[in-house]
Design a protein with these regions (language model features):
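Conserved short histidine dyad/triad with adjacent acidic residue
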Residues: 15-16, 31-46
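A short, N-terminal "cap"/entry segment at the start of jelly-roll beta-barrel domains
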Residues: 1-27, 111-132
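A generic "binding-loop/recognition-motif" signal
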Residues: 26-28, 37, 47, 66, ...
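Ligand-binding loop in jelly-roll beta-barrel domains
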Residues: 80-106
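Short acidic-glycine-tyrosine-enriched beta hairpin
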Residues: 66-80
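Glycine- and acidic-residue-biased ligand/ion/polar-headgroup-sensing regions
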Residues: 49-59, 64
Protein backbone atom coordinates (compact mmCIF):
# COMPACT_ATOMS: atom_id res chain seq x y z
CA UNK A 1 0.00 0.00 0.00
CA UNK A 2 1.35 3.41 -0.93
CA UNK A 3 -0.82 5.42 1.44
CA UNK A 4 -1.28 5.46 5.19
CA UNK A 5 -4.38 4.82 7.33
CA UNK A 6 -4.49 5.60 11.04
CA UNK A 7 -7.11 6.32 13.71
CA UNK A 8 -5.50 9.73 14.22
CA UNK A 9 -7.36 10.69 17.39
CA UNK A 10 -6.28 7.47 19.16
CA UNK A 11 -2.69 7.76 17.92
CA UNK A 12 -2.48 11.39 19.05
CA UNK A 13 -4.03 10.78 22.47
CA UNK A 14 -1.77 7.76 23.17
CA UNK A 15 1.40 9.58 22.10
CA UNK A 16 3.85 10.30 24.93
CA UNK A 17 6.67 11.60 22.69
CA UNK A 18 7.24 15.29 22.13
CA UNK A 19 7.30 14.64 18.37
CA UNK A 20 6.80 11.56 16.23
CA UNK A 21 6.64 11.42 12.44
CA UNK A 22 3.94 8.94 11.41
CA UNK A 23 4.10 9.17 7.62
CA UNK A 24 5.94 11.14 4.97
CA UNK A 25 4.84 11.45 1.34
CA UNK A 26 6.45 13.52 -1.39
CA UNK A 27 4.32 16.62 -0.72
CA UNK A 28 3.06 16.24 2.87
CA UNK A 29 3.89 14.76 6.26
CA UNK A 30 1.82 13.63 9.27
CA UNK A 31 3.33 14.29 12.72
CA UNK A 32 1.90 13.81 16.24
CA UNK A 33 3.07 15.87 19.21
CA UNK A 34 2.71 16.04 22.97
CA UNK A 35 3.77 19.44 24.32
CA UNK A 36 4.29 19.14 28.08
CA UNK A 37 2.43 21.32 30.61
CA UNK A 38 3.80 24.87 30.61
CA UNK A 39 6.08 24.18 27.62
CA UNK A 40 5.98 25.51 24.08
CA UNK A 41 7.21 24.60 20.62
CA UNK A 42 9.12 27.86 20.34
CA UNK A 43 8.62 30.69 17.89
CA UNK A 44 9.39 29.63 14.33
CA UNK A 45 8.80 30.46 10.68
CA UNK A 46 8.57 27.72 8.04
CA UNK A 47 8.94 27.91 4.27
CA UNK A 48 6.00 25.50 4.11
CA UNK A 49 2.34 25.36 5.05
CA UNK A 50 1.26 23.69 8.30
CA UNK A 51 -2.09 22.43 9.62
CA UNK A 52 -2.50 21.77 13.35
CA UNK A 53 -5.42 20.05 15.13
CA UNK A 54 -5.62 19.87 18.92
CA UNK A 55 -6.94 16.59 20.39
CA UNK A 56 -6.38 17.24 24.13
CA UNK A 57 -5.28 19.99 26.49
CA UNK A 58 -5.51 23.75 26.28
CA UNK A 59 -3.11 26.22 24.82
CA UNK A 60 -2.41 29.26 22.74
CA UNK A 61 -1.37 29.44 19.12
CA UNK A 62 0.42 32.65 18.27
CA UNK A 63 0.36 33.71 14.61
CA UNK A 64 2.07 36.93 13.55
CA UNK A 65 1.65 38.38 17.04
CA UNK A 66 -2.03 37.44 17.42
CA UNK A 67 -2.99 35.15 20.30
CA UNK A 68 -5.59 32.40 19.71
CA UNK A 69 -6.83 30.20 22.59
CA UNK A 70 -7.20 26.54 21.51
CA UNK A 71 -8.41 23.28 23.02
CA UNK A 72 -9.76 19.90 21.88
CA UNK A 73 -11.29 20.22 18.42
CA UNK A 74 -9.56 23.45 17.38
CA UNK A 75 -7.55 23.57 14.18
CA UNK A 76 -5.18 26.13 12.70
CA UNK A 77 -3.78 26.60 9.21
CA UNK A 78 -0.41 28.34 9.28
CA UNK A 79 0.66 29.59 5.84
CA UNK A 80 4.32 29.51 4.84
CA UNK A 81 6.23 32.53 6.12
CA UNK A 82 3.99 33.05 9.17
CA UNK A 83 5.75 33.58 12.51
CA UNK A 84 4.07 31.19 14.96
CA UNK A 85 4.31 29.36 18.27
CA UNK A 86 2.23 26.78 20.14
CA UNK A 87 2.13 27.18 23.93
CA UNK A 88 0.62 24.67 26.38
CA UNK A 89 -1.34 26.53 29.07
CA UNK A 90 -2.88 23.42 30.65
CA UNK A 91 -1.67 21.17 33.45
CA UNK A 92 -1.53 18.12 31.15
CA UNK A 93 0.03 17.45 27.76
CA UNK A 94 -1.20 19.46 24.78
CA UNK A 95 -1.75 16.67 22.27
CA UNK A 96 -1.99 17.59 18.62
CA UNK A 97 -1.29 16.40 15.13
CA UNK A 98 0.21 18.40 12.35
CA UNK A 99 0.34 18.15 8.58
CA UNK A 100 3.32 19.78 6.92
CA UNK A 101 3.23 20.50 3.21
CA UNK A 102 5.87 19.81 2.02
CA UNK A 103 7.49 17.60 4.71
CA UNK A 104 9.55 19.18 7.50
CA UNK A 105 11.21 16.24 9.31
CA UNK A 106 13.12 13.09 8.30
CA UNK A 107 11.20 9.82 8.02
CA UNK A 108 11.17 8.00 11.36
CA UNK A 109 11.94 11.07 13.48
CA UNK A 110 10.99 10.54 17.13
CA UNK A 111 11.91 13.06 19.81
CA UNK A 112 11.03 11.91 23.33
CA UNK A 113 11.41 15.46 24.68
CA UNK A 114 11.60 19.03 23.42
CA UNK A 115 15.25 19.07 24.50
CA UNK A 116 15.87 16.10 22.19
CA UNK A 117 14.21 18.01 19.35
CA UNK A 118 16.16 21.20 20.05
CA UNK A 119 19.52 19.41 20.04
CA UNK A 120 18.86 17.20 16.97
CA UNK A 121 20.53 19.05 14.11
CA UNK A 122 19.77 16.27 11.62
CA UNK A 123 15.99 15.90 11.82
CA UNK A 124 15.03 18.08 8.85
CA UNK A 125 13.52 16.43 5.78
CA UNK A 126 16.11 14.93 3.42
CA UNK A 127 13.85 13.92 0.52
CA UNK A 128 13.26 10.34 1.70
CA UNK A 129 9.59 9.34 1.99
CA UNK A 130 7.68 6.51 3.68
CA UNK A 131 6.51 5.33 0.25
CA UNK A 132 8.82 2.80 -1.42
Amino acid sequence: MKGYIVQIEDATLKNENYRQVLFTAKHCQLVIMNVQAGDQIGEEIHDLDQFIRVEAGEGVIMMDGQKHAVSDGFAAVIPAGTRHNVINTSSDGLKLYSLYSPPEHKVGTVHKTKKDADTDEHHHFDGTTSVA
